[in-house]
Regions:
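Active-site cores that bind ATP or allylic diphosphates and position pyrophosphate for catalysis
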Residues: 77-211
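N-terminal Rossmann-like or analogous alpha/beta NTP/dinucleotide-binding catalytic cores
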Residues: 1-87, 178-179, 183-196
């Protein structure tokens, strides 16, 4: 197999290129090397997510054409103030506040605030077997809720970008931290909706400091 280093710097302002350069230096110091990606380049460029906006737009428009995307005007403080349940990774399960807005309501809200955009998920259980953690099931609507696809400033969400990138780069196995286990069901569902073949997932325990 081949190891791909993908730089997930969707928010270019918060993730300047020097951070990616430092990451490569740290990996080299640890004796970890990759076959393609990062500054090394390779056959599946671009490897920096900040350079892939046009690619993500194509998949975004496909989901939009399916009637699965809608504008959301909720602020983070409003969501946390609501007595909504939380996901296993600590985020608020979106209660669907803006899901049923009419065209007139959307137009009125746009006068005051630019919306972010969410993906409408079904009330469906997604089950998969993780290579390290074993069987895992989550209900998309109850345990996750409609999630962000694109921020109000136009930056695409991680949850969309990684699915598109994995497919275009021919990724067959994903090894990552257990903190992303709960993201996998919604990503698997998105692979299906976009007609893509998902990779196998392996979630490893995190290495944490004593404090």
């Amino acid at each position: 197999g081949r190891i791909v280093l993908r730089i997930e710097d969707l928010d270019a302002e918060r993730c300047p290129r020097r951070y990616a350069d430092q990451l490569e230096e740290d990996l080299g110091w640890l004796g970890l090397f990759w076959d393609e990606g990062g500054s090394k380049g390779g056959p599946h460029e671009p490897y920096y997510q900040s350079e892939c906006s046009g690619i993500y737009t194509e998949s975004y428009k496909k989901l939009e054409a399916m009637g699965l995307v809608y504008p959301c005007f909720c602020s983070r403080s409003q969501l946390h103030a609501a007595s909504a349940p939380h996901t296993s990774d600590g985020n608020v399960v979106y209660p669907g506040t803006c899901r049923g807005l009419t065209a007139e309501q959307i137009a009125e809200k746009r006068k005051k605030k630019a919306p972010a955009y969410r993906l409408m998920v079904p009330d469906e259980d997604i089950t998969f077997t993780d290579g390290c953690m074993g069987p895992h099931t989550e209900n998309l609507l109850r345990d996750c809720g409609d999630f962000y696809l694109r921020r109000a400033d136009g930056v695409f969400a991680y949850q969309l970008a990684v699915v598109v990138d994995d497919a275009l780069m021919g990724v067959t196995e994903v090894v990552r931290g257990s903190d992303l286990l709960s993201s996998t069901p919604r990503q698997l569902w998105r692979y299906r909706e976009l007609g893509l073949t998902p990779p196998k997932f392996y979630h490893l325990p995190l290495l944490l400091a004593s404090d």
